[in-house]
């Protein structure tokens, strides 16, 4: 018996919608110890994340490591990066959240330019991951600018994967102004987060967000490896590149509607992603069937239980 075309069409549509609804979207978040000590990162926000990254390690040019410890607040809080991880691990006990180390800054350009240093760096990272029972590493090296820097960074990524093997979760964080790592490096990582934000207000409109995502997809980053990053902070509209936490706007009583994307704070106009914008950007990532979402960061948002929380809006759109 022949099945009418309309019925076939609707069957395909239902299957597509079902797959769309069932996709398990990944949620990656950064944890900053200084803000953790100040009580600015809610335990429920940590527990709602699939991936928690601690940006506490800096590479030296020879591949050795230095670590940034959190500062106490009002004589309270953890004082070492190891204790920060232990405390957060207790916060998320009973969840499937992965805890990973994040490497940023330092003398990374000199390190990745040297073959021996790349190997030393990767081995040191693996040792730290093992000693602290961590789930992996995120590289947030800002930013490769020249062809040589992209090549060196890509070689460092390949060396990291070679040393780590498949035991650890390995990601890199890139930006629309700096994303052209090699195809081999793209294949080597588990996922790539794209920082669709910055100190410049041009990054905030939905149109720019969508075009940046399409740009890196066209370059060759697979959609199933791409995690879209959104900001939980605002920047000055005049391009002076000042930043301020969304939390501050709420605390000052400046947020009056989910549709709001501008606020005048201490005499200056800031642009930011309000709740409706976060919802729209999250929905776009889902429509594009990306791996998931990332934010910068939990400390600049409201607690998850607050109805004005941007993270809460993101999770609602993801079906959490």
Give the residues covered by each predicted segment.
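Conserved, mostly hydrophobic/aromatic
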Residues: 52, 101, 139, 192, ...
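Active-site groove signature of glycoside hydrolases
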Residues: 105, 124-150, 180, 195-198, ...
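Glycan-recognition patch characteristic of GH18 chitinases/ENGases
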Residues: 22-127, 204-210
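Hydrophobic h-region of N-terminal signal peptides that target proteins for export
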Residues: 12-21
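Glycan-binding loop/region signatures in secreted carbohydrate-active enzymes
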Residues: 48, 68, 223-286, 304, ...
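Substrate-binding surface in catalytic domains of secreted glycosidases
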Residues: 28-34, 62-79, 142-253
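Bacterial N-terminal signal peptides that target proteins for export
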Residues: 1-8
